[in-house]
Design a protein with these regions (language model features):
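Accessory, non-catalytic peripheral segments of nucleic-acid enzymes
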Residues: 228-344
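Structural alpha-beta junctions
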Residues: 42, 73, 100-102, 148, ...
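N-terminal active-site segment of His-dependent metallophosphoesterases
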Residues: 1-65, 135, 140-150, 334, ...
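Short histidine/acidic/glycine/proline-rich micro-motifs that form metal-
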Residues: 52-54, 80-84, 211-212, 270-272
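A conserved active-site cap/scaffold subdomain adjacent to cofactor or substrate pockets
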Residues: 187, 191-253
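His/Asp/Glu-rich metal-coordinating catalytic cores
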Residues: 45, 54-204
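Conserved beta-strand elements of the Class I
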Residues: 5, 119-121, 224
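Structural beta-sheet core signal
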Residues: 6, 48, 76, 154, ...
């Protein structure tokens, strides 16, 4: 019997501005790293199902954190946040692979790829939906031949049943393909989506991430223990983050509850003046020693002032996006200078 601990989407290096202070943003980064370390230290051999990093390239300190987590793992699957989808780009995950970490990623961007390790099958992030689907079908065909009558599982990093999510930076597993894959596999485990759920009577398991990165993905979080023999699979999950304990809604103007241990606080209600809301928000921060983010969802004079910047899609020009992606790297200053020259 082999034992594996499954976890996904630690998003090491995440930086949040909305709903945070400079100090709490750093604390959130540390919380994400700590959650990943704890998950990787679970029973048996640990496996990360993607998005070890929040961005494909990272400062040295973040890469060191990724090395500490990946070095504890049996395998680390490449997710969409880990990949650049451009030939010749060396990502942080590539760097870890060069340093000896067990990374599963496509050898090139133009061919389907799966990896098998006994009963475990992996399909990492691909550059297109077409390649991704072919890789899954190839894995199923291989398992059907080599694992017929014996236990096997498939591990992916993608959305489930979101047909619009088929671009190069996000992929999809449809129910129709899942049903076909389940002819060869006992279970399918998915990284990528941050809230846990199951499909096909529990045989398709969406793990959910290890720790909330913002208000958008708050839910109970779990790690999963997988016990595999030649002919039997046992799965259990352990709660590693509790929404009831770590999240709270607070009514504006009312006496504050005990906020010790609460990491995410949503301030709700209505007010006549914005100044009063600002004062109350400050009071919340002062009485929440463990807060990582406090959101203002109070409406003032009928106009919502909720700050959901981190969770809303942002439309930006190419130069702004490149600057944001390079922020914190050695290329940021160089790009800024080149952009100024082109503008002139």
């Amino acid at each position: 019997m082999e034992i594996f601990t499954l976890f996904t989407d630690p998003h090491i290096g995440t930086r949040r501005v909305a709903n945070t202070t400079r100090e709490s943003s750093k604390l959130l980064q540390e919380a994400l790293y700590s959650a990943a370390l704890e998950a990787a230290d679970g029973p048996g051999k640990s496996i990360c199902l993607g998005d070890l990093f929040d961005r494909s390239t990272n400062p040295e300190g973040v890469i060191v954190q990724g090395f500490a987590v990946a070095g504890r793992c049996r395998w680390v699957l490449a997710g969409n946040h880990d990949c650049a989808n451009r030939e010749g780009v060396v990502t942080s995950l590539d760097a870890l692979q060069e340093m000896g970490c067990p990374i599963i990623s496509p050898p090139n961007l133009s061919a389907p790829y799966f990896f098998a390790d006994g009963p475990l099958y992996f399909v990492p992030h691909h550059a297109s939906q077409q390649l991704f689907e072919q890789a899954m079908l190839d894995a199923a065909a291989h398992a059907g031949r080599e694992r017929a009558g014996r236990a096997s599982v498939l591990m992916l990093h993608c959305n489930y049943d979101q047909p619009f999510a088929t671009e190069d930076d996000t992929l999809n597993l449809s129910p129709a393909i899942a049903q076909k894959l389940l002819e060869s596999f006992d279970y399918i485990f998915l990284g990528h989506e941050h809230k846990p759920s199951t499909q096909f009577d529990g045989r398709v398991v969406i793990l959910g991430n290890t720790h909330p990165t913002s208000f958008a993905d708050i839910s109970d979080k779990f790690s999963y223990q997988l016990e595999i023999t030649d002919y039997e699979i046992t799965l259990r999950r352990d709660r590693i983050w509790s929404k009831d304990e770590r999240f709270a809604s607070v009514m504006f103007g009312q006496e504050l509850p005990d906020l010790r241990g609460v990491q995410f606080i949503d301030v709700i209600g209505a007010a006549d003046e914005a100044v009063a809301v600002a004062d109350f928000m400050q009071q919340v921060w002062e009485n929440a020693p463990d807060a990582l983010a406090v959101r203002n969802s109070v409406s003032v004079a009928g106009v919502s002032v909720a700050d959901d910047e981190a969770e809303k899609p942002v439309v930006e020009d190419l130069r702004t996006r490149i600057s944001r992606e390079l922020d914190g790297t050695d290329l940021a200053d160089l790009f800024s200078e080149l952009a100024k020259e082109v503008a002139v």
